[in-house]
């Protein structure tokens, strides 16, 4: 019972779309109506509001971190299994991608996935963050950086995560993020993906 409740709460936390919330607070257009149409930090940055983009990034990462950390703190008192923690991690990302509070139209999950990984394994999250930074500064293409870091996540998890269920969860998280980036993959292959801060 507690396992199911933990997963449900994690999904609801993940469903808080900070791109939409922050944009509304600053009186900006809904990020789903301009640029790529994705409610995420990169698209909010296209509005020219760097502070709003930064807050979106922090909020989306924080909700993944909080959802999983909360479950880990309560794991022993509530008798949550390691598999339940893995499910909680997935639920936070699913909530971000298909949020119940915003018509199931969510983001691509990069920041939230990073927050989730930070709660499961700081070392895994650090590896992914470093790869993202190197690729982002080197190529100035956010999606390429995200895809590279995403592919690296399950490999890093093999070395740093203590439970098999968490490694499988990381693999599923990576597959979901890759799925949500399918249009970006096409643009990358066609050489028309926008640069960080670009208008497309």
UniProtKB/Swiss-Prot annotation:
UniProt cross-references to Pfam families, sorted A to Z: G3P_acyltransf
Gene Ontology MF annotations: acyl-phosphate glycerol-3-phosphate acyltransferase activity
UniProt keyword annotations, A-Z: Cell inner membrane, Cell membrane, Lipid biosynthesis, Lipid metabolism, Membrane, Phospholipid biosynthesis, Phospholipid metabolism, Transferase, Transmembrane, Transmembrane helix
Location(s) in or outside the cell: Cell inner membrane
Enzyme class: transferase
Membrane topology label: Multi-pass membrane protein
Organism superkingdom: Bacteria
TM stretches of this protein: 2-22, 51-71, 84-104, 114-134, 159-179
Main location: membrane
Reaction catalysed by this enzyme: an acyl phosphate + sn-glycerol 3-phosphate = a 1-acyl-sn-glycero-3-phosphate + phosphate
E.C. number(s) listed in UniProt: 2.3.1.275
Record pathway: Lipid metabolism; phospholipid metabolism
InterPro entries: G3P_acylTferase_PlsY (IPR003811)
Gene Ontology CC annotations of this record: plasma membrane
Entry's Gene Ontology BP terms: phospholipid biosynthetic process
General function of this protein: Catalyzes the transfer of an acyl group from acyl-phosphate (acyl-PO(4)) to glycerol-3-phosphate (G3P) to form lysophosphatidic acid (LPA). This enzyme utilizes acyl-phosphate as fatty acyl donor, but not acyl-CoA or acyl-ACP.
Record PANTHER family: GLYCEROL-3-PHOSPHATE ACYLTRANSFERASE-RELATED (PTHR30309:SF0), INNER MEMBRANE PROTEIN YGIH (PTHR30309)
Subunit composition and interactions: Probably interacts with PlsX.
Name this polypeptide is given: Glycerol-3-phosphate acyltransferase
